[in-house]
């Protein structure tokens, strides 16, 4: 009897052991949703820049982006403009296919949009004409009392044009009287006459006034049109030949990198005057305001406004000397300021403080003039710098 009970217990134990060790079929778990993305930025991440986001999320049926700058999107791969500097936390939130506890529905990254002026100094460059000759000058814009630093002396006499190459930290000055273009370091040192009308092969520098830098070239206006050369003055050539057709003598110019247009004022002392634009390839010449006697030009491409110093002249719409503002197409012309008894040859904008500068001259060459600073609509003018004879001017951020 005891043997029977023993064998029954043994059989029951064996049956239980076999049942308890049987493997359970688990199957394949549902796929999870994992949020992820990458990005690339134009302009080396310097503001303003466009950032392209590439959604690399797994098993997501929807996306919501928060870019940390007030913008959001539900696009799969959005492209976003960042025009402010700083650190921005970008968060992608995905909508899952299955509601699983092991989903990873959010992914965040910090994007650094860099300051384009980091390591640079804001400077107002200007030229002057004196009894003993002309020169270039610079004032660091630091909200303190303006302190003028003179360039190293040259043989300049009437420096009517200035352009700054911020990429290479160089300053170019044209001299109408000498017939030359000079190049300086950004601190006003190391002057070099890179073009001279008296040098064989450089005769086309002639009577230069307006000038700008574009890429690896300088462009200047003089009798007969627009001319250009390499940044070191080599290979001078006529670029847009206007000859005796308006604009016969561009005396101040500015280039718009967005539209590819050159905006200019044409001399009226000896020619037909007018405010024009022309495409960089010479096509599309347009006269917006005919016959005006403009001597200085500054265009705010962001707001679409043009500022000009204009003399009243016969046959034009301007009947009173002054500083004028209009739309970039010449419409809405109105006077916003005054200039002195002699011509104003320079205007420029400080975009950090939203201020317009222009020269105010009493005599041709005595230091009895001033640089006026005002709001961009001409209001609240102030005598910013006195005891000077200002001519051309430009505000830039540059490495000194």
Regions found by a protein language model. Give the residues of each.
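Extracellular/lumenal mature domains of secreted and surface-exposed proteins
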Residues: 21-120
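An edge-strand/N-cap motif at the start of beta-rich repeat modules
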Residues: 110-151, 399
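Short coil/turn segments that connect the beta-strands within blades of beta-propeller domains
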Residues: 121-123, 167-169, 215-216, 258-260, ...
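Residue position within the beta-strands of beta-propeller blades
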Residues: 125-127, 172-173, 219-221, 263-265, ...
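Short glycine/acidic-enriched loop and turn motifs that connect beta-strands
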Residues: 130-134, 177-179, 225, 268-271, ...
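Surface loop/turn motifs at the tips and blade-to-blade linkers of beta-strand repeat domains
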Residues: 150-157, 194-204, 240-246, 287-292, ...
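Repeated scaffold domains used in trafficking and secretory/extracellular systems
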Residues: 157-164, 204-212, 248-255, 292-301, ...
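Blade-level signature of beta-propeller repeat domains, shared across WD40, Kelch, NHL, RCC1
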Residues: 369-400
């Amino acid at each position: 009897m005891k043997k029977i009970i023993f064998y029954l217990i043994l059989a029951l134990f064996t049956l239980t052991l076999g049942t308890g060790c049987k493997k359970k079929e688990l199957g394949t778990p549902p796929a999870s949703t994992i949020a992820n993305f990458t990005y690339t930025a134009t302009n080396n991440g310097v503001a303003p820049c466009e950032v392209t986001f590439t959604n690399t999320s797994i098993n997501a049926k929807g996306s919501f982006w928060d870019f940390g700058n007030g913008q959001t999107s539900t696009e799969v791969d959005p492209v976003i403009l960042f025009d402010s500097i700083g650190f921005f936390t970008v968060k992608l939130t995905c909508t899952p296919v299955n509601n699983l506890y092991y989903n990873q529905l959010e992914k965040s990254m910090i994007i650094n949009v860099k300051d384009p002026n980091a390591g640079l100094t804001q400077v107002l460059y200007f030229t002057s004409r004196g009894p003993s000759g002309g020169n270039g000058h610079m004032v660091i814009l630091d909200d303190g009392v303006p302190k003028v630093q003179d360039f190293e002396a040259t043989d300049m006499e009437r420096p009517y044009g200035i352009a700054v190459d911020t990429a290479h930290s160089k300053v170019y000055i044209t001299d109408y009287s000498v017939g030359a273009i000079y190049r300086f370091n950004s601190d006003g040192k190391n002057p070099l006459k890179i073009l001279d009308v008296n040098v064989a092969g450089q005769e086309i520098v002639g009577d230069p006034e307006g000038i700008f830098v574009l890429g690896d070239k300088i462009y200047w206006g003089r009798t007969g049109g627009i001319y250009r050369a390499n940044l070191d003055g080599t290979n001078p050539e006529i670029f847009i030949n206007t000859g005796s057709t308006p604009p016969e003598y561009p005396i101040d110019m500015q280039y718009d990198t967005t539209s590819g247009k050159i905006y200019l004022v044409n001399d009226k002392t000896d020619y037909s005057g007018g405010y024009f634009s022309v495409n960089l390839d010479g096509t599309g010449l347009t006269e917006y305001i005919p016959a005006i006697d403009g001597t200085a030009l500054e265009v705010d491409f962001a707001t679409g406004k043009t500022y000009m110093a204009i003399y009243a002249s016969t046959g034009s719409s301007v009947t009173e000397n002054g500083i004028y503002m209009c739309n970039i197409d010449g419409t809405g012309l109105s006077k916003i300021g005054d200039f002195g008894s002699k011509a104003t040859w320079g205007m420029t904008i400080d975009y950090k403080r939203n201020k317009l500068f222009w020269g105010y001259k009493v005599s041709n060459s005595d230091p009895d003039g001033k640089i006026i600073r005002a709001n961009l609509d001409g209001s609240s003018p102030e005598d910013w710098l006195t005891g000077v004879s200002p001519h051309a001017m430009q505000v830039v951020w540059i490495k000194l």
